[in-house]
Design a protein with these regions (language model features):
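Residue-level signature for tetratricopeptide repeat
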Residues: 109-110, 141-142, 164, 181
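Alpha-helical segment of the N-proximal tetratricopeptide repeat
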Residues: 101-129, 214
């Protein structure tokens, strides 16, 4: 049994938070000087894997590509929704011209590498930032992929499903994944109810859907 909440905390602890000179950083990114951050200080997260290879090279560390920080910020937002810097990160991401392309390519790269938990956290961060329903569908899909490999991810997937249902997100997918989880638990009656909700909300009827419904 794997405790995924602990695993997400552990992923968070692998981020290094580097203190930034706020004014210099704003100038670098092109953030106007009148724009203010919520926090007095600014620490940007970066995956330790990038640092360890450059640790003795101060010039390299000073000139780390913004790309690495984009990944760090999305992982931080995705792993800890209460992190005090999140509002500042979202503000920064708004000013980085390549944010959208960068996060999309990072997510598909992590999925190709089968680093699904990283992909999941990047998607969570991206959803928090964009509130894009297509991103939420991907969160559920990647969550289900992790759950198929390891059933102890179920509770996190169910939390995401509940979030979608409680907040009336205009997507049918939460009911499909709910049905799959219920069917796996042997609760066929509840699975059928969820599948009917899925169809009522405009979900596509595929072979899998028909199987749950019989």
């Amino acid at each position: 049994f794997m405790d995924y909440k602990a695993k997400i905390k552990e992923r968070m602890s692998k981020l290094l938070f580097l203190e930034m000179n706020k004014d210099g950083f704003k100038e670098n990114i092109g953030i106007p000087s009148y724009v203010t951050f919520k926090n007095k200080d600014l620490y940007l997260p970066i995956s330790s894997e990038y640092i360890s290879s450059n640790i003795n090279d101060e010039i390299k560390i000073k000139n780390l590509p913004i790309y690495y920080f984009i990944e760090g910020m999305f992982i931080a937002i995705g792993a800890d929704e209460n992190l005090r810097f999140n509002d500042d990160y979202e503000l920064i991401l708004d000013y980085i011209k390549d944010t959208e392309n960068c996060i999309k390519s990072l997510i598909s790269k992590r999925i190709q590498e089968e680093r699904y938990l990283d992909a999941y956290l990047l998607l969570k961060g991206y959803y928090s930032y964009s509130k894009d329903l297509e991103v939420m569908k991907k969160i559920l899909l990647v969550g289900e992929t992790i759950r198929e490999q390891d059933s102890s991810f179920k509770d996190i997937l169910l939390d995401d499903i509940e979030y979608c249902i409680t907040n009336n997100l205009k997507i049918a997918e939460p009911y499909l994944y709910k049905a799959i989880v219920l069917k796996n638990e042997g609760d066929f009656k509840a699975a059928r109810v969820a599948i009917n909700e899925y169809i009522n909300k405009g979900g596509k009827v595929t072979k899998e859907v028909e199987i749950i419904n019989t």
